[in-house]
Amino acid sequence: NGVRNMFGYTGTYKGKEVSVMGSGMGMPSIGIYSYELYSQYGVEQIIRIGSAGAYAPQCNLFDLVIAQGACTNSNWASQYNIPGGTYSAIADFELASKAYQVAKEKGYPVHVGNILSSDIFYNDQPEVWKKWAQLGCLAVEMESYALYCNAAYLGKKALCILTVSDSFITHQETTAEERQNSFTHMMEVALELI
């Protein structure tokens, strides 16, 4: 807890040790924390949980979204100097498959697919999300792409499990209280992956 004032806590779940901590907001924050956890603290897998805005009509408030892949409008992967290319950031297949199975067994509405990790929260082009939706992105958040890139680069595992907090299609949204008190299904699924 003495590094960067981003507090982490370690306990046990069903007899297995598990650590939890915040990841900040956006790719720069999770990029720093995940890189250091993987490279300096021996962490082998990171499961990020968080909220997302739905781009797909089948994704309703409180549904889970397992980010099988993460697209981005960021230049995060430019650091890898891939000549003429972009990097497709994906989740660890084993973690994603197990998360899907756990969610189904628990009866939680769950969707699996691509999401958008965006650098932009308040977009000056309010309709741009439709282009990402047309390409099959289920939802938008701000961290998964950087986490998946760091995991791939360092030979580690990563997964993002999201809860739909609002919809770009219906304009429905959860309240701050609902986000604080009701987003527990993704936590339950994540804990079963330990």
Regions found by a protein language model. Name each.
Residues 85-134:
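Active-site rim beta-loop-alpha module in soluble metabolic enzymes
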Residues 1-97:
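Metabolite-binding pocket within alpha/beta catalytic cores that recognizes anionic/polar moieties
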Residues 168-194:
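His/Asp/Glu-rich mid-to-C-terminal helical/loop segments that flank catalytic regions of hydrolases
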Residues 49-53, 154-169:
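Glycine-rich phosphate/pyrophosphate-binding loops
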Residues 53, 116-121, 146, 164-167:
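Glycine-rich beta-alpha junction loops
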Residues 98-106, 150, 189-193:
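Generic non-transmembrane alpha-helical segments
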Residues 126-159, 163:
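A C-terminal functional module that forms or caps the active site or interfaces directly
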